[in-house]
Design a protein with these regions (language model features):
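Flavin-dependent oxidoreductase catalytic cores
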Residues: 1-395, 399, 403-415, 423, ...
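Short gly/ser/thr-rich secondary-structure transition/capping motifs
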Residues: 6-15, 45, 374-379, 457-463, ...
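Short, structured coil segments at secondary-structure junctions
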Residues: 59, 295, 318-319, 454, ...
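Hydrophobic, well-ordered secondary-structure elements that form the walls
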Residues: 260, 291, 314, 326, ...
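Helix-enriched interaction subdomains in cytosolic or periplasmic regions
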Residues: 351-364, 469-491
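Rossmann-like dinucleotide/flavin-binding elements
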Residues: 386-420, 459-470, 480-555, 592-604, ...
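Rossmann-like dinucleotide-binding cores of NAD(P)H-dependent redox enzymes
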Residues: 417-453, 523-576, 635
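Feature captures the FAD/FMN-dependent oxidoreductase FAD-binding
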Residues: 445-486, 579-588
Length: 654
């Protein structure tokens, strides 16, 4: 197979790790659990296999997609684990592990790729090397493992690797990062043991080295063994990059490790290990480059490798031998073939919202991608081309309207899109005014190119009325008219210094130097507006009525936003509902006790209160047209992933 586009000669060159022959430099790192459960029902397993099948057909070289938890009961009969991974432990002991893992391996090999699995033992919840808490976001006091329990775990690692090998996979990766038990032993912040498994680096490494040795004794020399390692710990008392490199040297010296998978961040921090759009593309790749300079081991780097061009640059600069790309492959399962052909403008861009993960982890919903409604649903039949196309009018050029217009045109309908503003994107336009959200403009630009290529007629500055829609004589009308700003029933909300956050971000209203932000939206809007105000040098106080900040923003994103706001001196108040706004005074009331408090010393009040569905046209037209639909924020104000998925479901029906 040719090496591909001349701009990507390094990315599409072959490479060898251990006995694994790789046709390009792209690894798809572990994320299989979010796309389906290979060990669950047959339907769940098929979702998992269908997801990977598409990416394998596209040319993936290495799928590290089977991430499995060890049995975390750790010798204690009847013990009930707690915390992350508690309900999904012990995959390797399942009676059908070999059969399902074997199907995964066979699928990869059938398409010319290698297949590896990752062994996870989530630590600190409740198992830990010492009594120190694993992170600062909870107070779960862990059980301190004794030496018999450590040996039990080492044996479990060896057994699990043997099961992986017996299923036909090419290798195993140990998860020594992101608050895994192995990392907790490595870290001076969480390991203060005084026996042979603590103290200096030799002691802190002992558990990991003994696990590796046990795996090698079980699997032999030809089975690939890799270590996924935090390059440094960006929190108080953790190890720095110099010590991380020394850990790498000692792993290399064993002669039993085939590669090092270099990452940054933890489950809860700033950064998290799934870095949101607050961070630059490949932000810590240069740190991986330090490891590559110091070691002979092949280096894999994962961390916001958001495009093929970023991946190429990382390889070309010598920062890594391979790159891990997960969310970029969520956004476009055909990224590899499009990049190989130089069709860069046809690749759906990942915009780093992390809603793909938060949907599952915060709300218990199915996996979904903000920019690609097909991701996670590959097992469903694709859209069917229509034999006789209809004329469809789509009103509204936000995420829902853009996706609907494109999908219906791809099905064979004739489509016109009306947008009342002079630009497409809807509320994404306002959100993109914050520098960490600039990736939103990439998605808007992608959709514009897509519509133009498909031949969708786009009419900007075109307001829709009941009469103009009827006059268009469309067979089908789709109303994606978005949401209006919600103005809660707060006394004084009409005062001239009370501003709407969206209007402030668009520059239509100007906030004073001292701002009180009324936060009555549960996702990113208050944090985004606060970030915008901070960038303008404003002094900001945020008032939330909820017991927690941004309750629908999950652990992988909240840290980055709060780190920025905290560093800027933003004051956050929770459990306070704004009752009354006056000139020079705001009255709040505690949602539980009813205790009133006053806020003073402000120039402006800015509202971040979400939206109210703009459904007036739908209500007036639904009885006057043969087929009219409503979707996106016009139906219920929610996030991008809901809008694009609803667009896809609607497109199936028309």
């Amino acid at each position: 197979m040719p090496h591909g586009h001349p701009q990507l000669t390094n990315l599409f060159s072959p490479f060898t790790i251990g006995k694994m022959q790789l046709r390009n430099r792209i690894m798809l790192p572990p994320h299989g659990r979010v796309t389906g459960n290979p060990f669950g029902t047959e339907e769940e397993a098929e979702r998992f296999f269908a997801y990977w099948r598409l990416r394998l057909q596209d040319g993936a070289a290495w799928i590290d997609g089977l991430n499995c938890f060890l049995d975390n009961t750790v010798m204690i009969p009847g013990f009930e684990p707690q915390g992350l991974g508690a309900t999904i432990g012990g995959y390797f002991r399942l009676p059908h592990f070999r059969e399902r893992a074997g199907r995964y391996a066979a699928l990869c090999h059938e398409h010319g790729a290698v297949a590896t699995a990752q062994i996870i033992m989530q630590g600190g919840m409740p198992h830990s090397p010492s009594g120190r808490l694993a992170n600062y976001t909870n107070n779960l006091v862990p059980h301190i493992l004794n030496e018999d329990e450590i040996q039990w775990l080492i044996n479990e690692y060896a057994f699990s690797a043997g099961e992986i090998q017996a299923a036909g996979l090419d290798g195993v990766e140990l998860h020594a990062n992101h608050e895994d038990l192995l990392q907790l032993f490595l870290s001076p912040a969480t390991n203060d043991r005084t026996d042979g498994y603590g103290g200096d680096l030799d002691g802190r490494l002992r558990f990991l080295l003994e696990a590796i040795a046990a795996i090698r004794a079980k699997t032999g020399p030809d089975f690939c063994v890799g270590i996924r390692l935090n390059m440094e710990e960006l929190f108080a008392g953790g190890y720095d990059a110099d010590e991380g490199i020394e850990i790498g040297r000692r792993l290399e010296a064993t002669g039993q490790v085939d590669y090092l998978h270099c990452v940054m961040g933890d489950n809860w921090g700033a950064p998290s290990y799934v870095q949101p759009h607050n961070y630059g593309a490949g932000q810590w790749a240069a740190t991986a480059g330090r490891f590559k300079q110091a070691l002979r081991l092949p280096i894999v780097y994962t961390g916001r490798v958001s495009s093929a061009q970023v991946a190429e640059e990382i390889i070309a600069k010598g920062y890594a031998d391979m790159v891990g790309m997960a969310r970029a492959m969520f956004a476009d399962g055909n990224l590899i073939s499009k990049a190989r052909a130089g069709k860069f403008e046809e690749i759906r861009p990942c915009i780093g919202t992390n809603d793909c993960l938060h949907r599952i982890l915060v709300e218990g919903l199915k996996f979904g991608c903000s920019v690609n409604p097909r991701t996670g649903y590959e097992s469903e039949a694709p859209l069917i081309q229509v034999k006789a196309g209809k004329y469809v009018l789509v009103v509204g050029g936000g995420p829902a309207g853009l996706e609907t217009a494109a999908l219906l045109r791809e099905k064979g309908h004739r489509v016109t899109l009306w947008e009342r503003d002079g630009v497409l994107g809807g509320q994404m336009q306002a959100a993109s005014r914050v520098k960490e959200n600039r990736a939103y403009t990439d998605f808007i630009a992608f959709q514009q190119r897509r519509l133009e290529k498909l031949g969708v007629e786009v009419c900007l500055n075109r307001s829709a009325t009941e009469e103009s829609i009827l006059a268009a004589q469309a067979d089908v009308v789709v109303l994606a008219t978005g949401a209006q700003a919600r103005r809660p029933a707060i006394e004084g909300i009409a005062l001239p210094f009370v501003l709407e956050g969206r209007e402030v971000m668009l520059g239509k209203q100007i906030a004073g130097e001292r701002v009180v932000l009324v936060a009555m939206e549960d996702h990113m809007q208050p944090l985004t507006i606060a970030s915008f105000l901070v960038d303008q040098g404003k002094r900001v106080r945020i008032v939330y009525p909820t017991p927690a900040i941004a309750p629908l923003v999950g652990k992988y994103s909240i840290g980055a936003s709060m780190a920025k706001l905290s560093s800027a001196g933003v004051e956050v108040r929770v459990m306070e509902r704004v009752e009354r706004i006056e000139s020079g005074r705001i009255l709040t009331r505690n949602i539980y006790s009813g205790v009133e408090q006053e806020l003073r010393d402000f120039d402006s009040v800015v509202l971040a209160c979400g939206g109210v569905a703009d459904d007036a046209l739908y209500r007036s037209l639904k009885s006057r047209l043969p087929e009219v639909h409503i979707l996106g924020d016009a139906y219920a104000p929610r996030r991008i992933s809901f809008a694009t998925r609803q667009a896809y479901n609607l497109a199936k029906l028309i």
